[in-house]
From Swiss-Prot:
Subcellular localization(s) per the UniProt record: Cytoplasm
Any one cellular-component term (Gene Ontology): cytoplasm
HAMAP family to which the protein is assigned, alphabetical: UDG
Protein name: Uracil-DNA glycosylase
Single GO MF descriptor: uracil DNA N-glycosylase activity
Job description of the protein: Excises uracil residues from the DNA which can arise as a result of misincorporation of dUMP residues by DNA polymerase or due to deamination of cytosine.
Class in the EC hierarchy, top level: hydrolase
Chain's gene name: ung
Family: Belongs to the uracil-DNA glycosylase (UDG) superfamily. UNG family.
Annotated keywords: Cytoplasm, DNA damage, DNA repair, Hydrolase
A biological process from GO: base-excision repair, AP site formation via deaminated base removal
Length: 228
């Protein structure tokens, strides 16, 4: 694939589609009506800003953004610095601690350093009303994120998709397993993590696959940005 191919090239035309305009208009109207919508407007498309199409090595699919204050910032499972790691992320850290030698559980939940290394942290729905999980499901975001997955499937090779839980696994049905790698496990939520997420070893498996294909492994130790 040409190194210059960007998200703008392959999904930029979605911005002109009626469904996408309607989704953005609905979210804008909700904000204008005084409702608190997460993440903040400038963070909604962060996953694409931080991980360009030609840089994607791993995709971790989430469902919809966290709906508590100061949590969501456009990356699945990640929270802003200074906010405690939510329960699913605590379980992700538990798994990393047993899977990756030397992993130290961080005192934060900010996963931007993963995104900067080529881990696309993609929620299938990109906004949510405060305190109201799944409130923005079926607005049109799913159509958009299906197009994102289709673009990765078509324009990239050897991407590792981590599909945790039935929702992500259903979303991943379109992925060509001849060209890409799929790692499946239950969701890391406390309701299901003990059914096989804990012990799945997805993080070490991903790094083995990357190294087998001549790529840099991911440093899974989340790092806060250093002060300039």
């Amino acid at each position: 694939m040409p190194a210059s191919l960007t998200w703008h090239d392959v999904i930029g035309q979605e911005k002109e589609q009626p469904y996408f305009k309607e989704t953005l208009a609905y979210v804008a109207a909700e904000r204008n009506a005084g409702k608190t919508i997460y993440p903040a407007q400038h963070d909604v498309f962060n996953a694409f800003r931080l991980t360009e199409l030609d840089q994607v090595k791993v995709v971790i699919l989430g469902q919809d953004p966290y709906h508590g204050p100061n949590q969501a910032h456009g990356l699945s499972f990640s929270v802003l610095p200074g906010v405690p790691a939510p329960p699913s992320l605590v379980n992700i850290y538990k798994e990393l601690a047993t899977d990756i030698p030397g992993f130290q559980r961080p005192n934060h939940g900010f996963l931007q350093s993963w995104a900067e290394q080529g881990v696309l942290l993609l929620n299938t729905v990109l906004t949510v009303e405060a305190g109201n999980a799944h409130s923005h499901a079926n607005l049109g975001w799913e159509t958009f994120t299906d197009k994102v997955i289709a673009a990765l499937n078509e324009h990239r090779d050897g991407v590792i998709f981590m599909l945790w839980g039935a929702h992500a696994q259903k979303k991943g049905r379109i992925i060509d397993t001849q060209r890409h790698f799929i790692l499946k496990a239950p969701h890391p939520s406390p309701l299901s993590a003990h059914r096989g997420f804990l012990g799945c070893k997805h993080f070490s498996q991903a790094n083995q696959l990357l190294q087998q294909h001549g790529q840099q492994p991911i440093d899974w130790q989340p790092k806060l940005p250093t002060a300039e």
